[in-house]
């Protein structure tokens, strides 16, 4: 381990074009699940100047009014623009894939893939500190706009936080970058003062900056033209924002717009749930869990646990306990994590793993999991 390193994570507001597309896709999914808990949805969204395209596969009892969903979501994100077209290119799920995932009891995975989950003891919600701080900045930036604390803010915005680690522990914040769209007549010096007071200082209460922390606010200067009027958005383009800020591995599969039979989503959520419970149980200071699946197969083809030399037990024993304790089939993950409920649009902004009330963030089973590990350790004569 290096004596000193700098780790960085970023976040975006709900009005960022890519994240707006994610929200639309997950709202479509939620609307399908409201009427049909067994709906199969794979929804992609493209946003560009004057047009939204919603494409993908949906097999459900009721297909929602997708054009209305797009317009309502754009409005809720804070945009006033109404003059845009919505093109809907939706068709049913492939019958081959439908057959592979049809049996509700032993439903196979909807695709192959490897998903990673991560947790560490750095913060209250067991996420890396740069990730937590970046999301706090963008959430407070949006709050400052919607609550009227800062006038002239617009929906688009981004934040980035760099934290200096010494021997693996966070020591200080080395740099903060905050970019926010604003009205043309907004005074930039006033904007900086307001952002420091209402966004940056409150966001850093859990881990304050020091006098040497570099703070960059709109470092490119004016940021008047932004959002969907200036940039093209697409679902699945903010994978590191959604997960661990690039501080943990990622298998490459996006989360939003996919029902629970897609292991890109259910597997990623379950891997996070497992890693979080391992750390919450005091069995490791940090933990990475990997799950790999084959299309049409219910059980994972690989399960891996890595506690980065911080584990109470061997990684092999923890892997054995994971296989015994958690139902890792798609049907099991859907049931355990309540993935047939319309909960996704609320989860897709400011990180999928930042809200303690979400099913995959629960740690109520940590104690029982620790008991199982102790039993396995006693039975095999030691970890």
What residue ranges belong to the model's regions?
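Glycine-rich anion/phosphate-binding loop at the beta-strand->alpha-helix junction
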Residues: 186-279
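Alpha-helical support elements that line or immediately flank enzyme active sites
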Residues: 14-33, 123-139, 259-282
